[in-house]
Amino acid sequence: MNIRMGTKGKRPLRSLTPRDKIHAIQRIHDGESKASVARDIGVPESTLRGWCKNEDKLRFMSRQSTTDKMCADALADKLDVSTGLLGPPEKRQRIDPSLPLNFSNKMKFDELGFKRAPLNGLDYSTNKNISELNYNGLAVDYVGFNGQHKVFSGDINRPANPSPNAISPLSSLTHLSGLTGLSQSPLAISFNELTTNLNLLAQLNPSLAAMSGLNSFPTTANNLRNSKPSVQPPLQVQSPRSDSGDRTPGLSVKNWAKQKPLSAVSSDVSCSINLTIKNEAKGGDIKSPSPSIAPSHVGSIISLSNLAEDPLLYWLKSQQTMLGLNSLYPPMGMTSPPIRSSTPQHIIQHAQTPPLPSAPLTPSSTPSGSLDEKNVAWYNWCKVFGASLNTLNPNSATLAALQANSLQHQHQPISAVSDGTDIADTSKGPFDNILYSHLTKESETPSVRSLSSNEHNQLDQIEGDEVTDPDLDAEIEGDVPGKPEDLSASAKRITPSQSPIASLVPESHTTEPCAKTSTTPSDCISRPGSVGGDCKKILDNMLYKIGGIKSHMPTIVDTACESEASFINEHNQHSNNNDISASNNNNNNSNKTDEEEKAKYLDLTGDNEDVKAIRHGEKFLQWLENCSNPRVTAVQLMQLRFLIAAIKSSNEPQVTEKPNKDLLENEENTEEDSCRNKIRRRK
């Protein structure tokens, strides 16, 4: 700062560099007033305001002027905190060393070297070179972390000085936000220490071992050109100081790309960052990594060390044990090709005691062949915990448990299903058929059941003749005492009613695909002494009794169903009548009353479906509250709870209004009937 005196009696003129102006602006950003800063540097306050307006231009000029003057002395001055802060000691800003760097306001570019708090763990006490900066918290042996002993090519045997073509990709961090040079970056320590920190972390956390390959691109490229890597003994972690006393590289990471894995599997897997070599008898071909979620311990018994190394597998196993689902998981002794992964994995040949017991394979937990035999554990977890989402049935998790228990009681042999492109197994047991029949039964809508035109009724007569199974009719009608066997065309397919009482069976008719699909599992359901019959009773109880459907609704629905059947029969009898006037005169009254009953039935079934849907939603909400899936959040549960409550409250006034509507309709019907009778009497 040069002070020049102009004419007498005037304020001394100061020629300030752009850097000095930037520091004055920074003091204003830090909270000082413009007046105090202007008084401190001897500049009018209006001039200082002009500098603040042209701050960007001044910063550009400051960068242009300082890049040419970079030298070791300036670097040492910037690294020394005592001289880095401007002003006399009483005006210096107190900086708490424990606080992080202050990046507030418009702080950027070169003033970071002055405004920075001393980084924790680094020794800035003397003017040292960057390569000599030590870590205070570590022992003296860790001075091997400096740049002279740094290994940049992934070879731990030879120390190498960094050359521009071997510099780690972390060197691009020095160019953040337009920073030029190490002196003006917040990372005043060199990137060598950053790569060393990654190596140290990789030793402490084996999951980060692949990150140690950040600085081994040349070696990786050389290894990928060779079809078979050179066999070396497995490299161990070296001690920081050898017995002879001379310095060695402090901590080194195992070079997985050069090491032959201990495996009896038919291929050698060599893992680096993102490239995988698979050496087989045919020759080495490079395959792109497929990130597999499943753990890579298939092919051997899982050891405790490998279980701890894979956090996803550990979490899966803990959830499995907590819910008592070990019996649904397959044993890990299956032979399969090694898994391509982006992280190096141990494949241990000798068997150890498994940490968690596993039961033999069940058909429900068999992996499908389309999964490439590697996503076994993850696939089974999705199958057990996501069963309700897959089958749209809230009770299917209970079904899975029932299925496993009954299969264990029957001592069925292990059957591996290999062709499974679908989630459901192709070889369906009786339980799958029961679930399928319940799903198809619930999917029928009243609109399908209540077709009223003559053409549809005649079409359904033809389809009923084709589809109706006499064995099924005989079995179901055998359950209903006092009802004669009717195999005529008017007897449509019989489905269980919406009530838990098995003796009330309404008659309804469906379209052809529903009838065909739901007659297939009939022999499994109707067998009285089999496990399927017991499971059918359990399913009926779960689907209807637990739901707590109102006691008066089933009887109303049944009477409505019977009236609908009578309406269909009468309508079919009069469909062949060619005299339109006679049919209108004779059947006008009966047709009108039947249509009204049919409309009432549709309203009741609509309400019944709403109630059932709300109850299923409440069950699903209760299941979500008890499940341990990490993706389910409290906000989602609250939203679902409010949604169900809103639908529930909107349905309640409709239920109360409907009896009044029914009374009014009955009165109108009686009035119309009396009017017709009077007209007929006059004739």
Curated annotation (Swiss-Prot):
Residues 7-58 form the HTH psq-type domain. SUPFAM superfamilies: Homeodomain-like. Residues 220-255, 336-369, 443-525, 572-597, 652-683 are annotated as: Disordered. Residues 34-54 bind DNA. Residues 227-242, 575-591 have a biased composition (Low complexity). It is found in: Nucleus. Residues 462-478 have a biased composition (Acidic residues). Pfam families: CENP-B_N (PF04218). PROSITE patterns: HTH_PSQ. Residues 338-352, 445-460 have a biased composition (Polar residues). Keywords: Developmental protein, DNA-binding, Nucleus, Phosphoprotein, Transcription, Transcription regulation. It comes from the Eukaryota. One of its GO terms (biological process) is antennal development. The keyword Signal does not apply. The keyword Hydrolase does not apply. One of its GO terms (cellular component) is nucleus. Probable transcription factor with a role in the retinal determination (RD) network. Regulates ato expression and is required for normal R8 induction and differentiation. Danr appears to repress Dan expression, but Dan is required for Danr expression anterior to the morphogenetic furrow (MF). Dan and Danr lie downstream of so and require dac function for highest levels of expression. Homomers. Interacts with itself, danr, ey and dac to form a complex (or complexes) containing the RD factors. This is Protein distal antenna. It comes from Drosophila pseudoobscura pseudoobscura.
